[in-house]
Amino acid sequence: MKLVPVALLYLGSLAFLGVDTARLDVAAEFRKKWNKWALSRGKRELRESSSYPTGLADVKAGPVQTLIRPQDVKGASRSPQASSPDAARIRVKRYRQSLNNFQGLRSFGCRFGTCTVQKLAHQIYHFTDKDKDGSAPRSKISPQGYGRRRRRSLPEAGLGRTLLQPPEPKLRGAPDSRVHQVLATLRI
């Protein structure tokens, strides 16, 4: 009774592993692909060679100016085919041609809608910020005023408390940006 399940298991695994371990004929598949590529290349070269100028009138028309830059070429120019007559027909990446045609329409920076909203909010903030005064009124800075400066100026502030470091001196000619103002306020 136990021999039947073991035999079935053995035959099943042999059939399964036999399929996986079968040798693939890689050389035959490669040969097929190579022949297909060579045939298509031969047809392409035949078409291109028939389109070359052969008459004297075509030569007198003048040289044809190509619009191919060295960085647009897909392959390296050191290939053995570079000296052949079809070297003039170099394949070019298509997206570069389309980008070069529309250079005036390109804009730098973020193109997402969220970036546009953020830029607009930033511009509105800067336009409305020019009317604001950067310094506090004198009545609030005095020792009778309120806030952190009053607490610092009171005599009992030094008992048992450590004060923050004084602000660093500003560099001459450096712009007084919002970030520096916030940092200076936090250090006071």
From Swiss-Prot:
The modification Arginine amide is found at residue 41. GO terms for biological process: adenylate cyclase-activating G protein-coupled receptor signaling pathway; adrenomedullin receptor signaling pathway; positive regulation of heart rate; regulation of systemic arterial blood pressure. GO terms for molecular function: adrenomedullin receptor binding; hormone activity. GO terms for cellular component: extracellular space. The modification Tyrosine amide is found at residue 146. Its main location: secreted. Residues 1-21 form the signal peptide. Keywords: Amidation, Cleavage on pair of basic residues, Disulfide bond, Hormone, Secreted, Signal. Disulfide bonds join 110-115. PANTHER family: ADRENOMEDULLIN, ADM (PTHR23414), PRO-ADRENOMEDULLIN (PTHR23414:SF3). Numerous actions have been reported most related to the physiologic control of fluid and electrolyte homeostasis. This is Pro-adrenomedullin. The lineage of its organism: Eukaryota, Metazoa, Chordata, Craniata, Vertebrata.
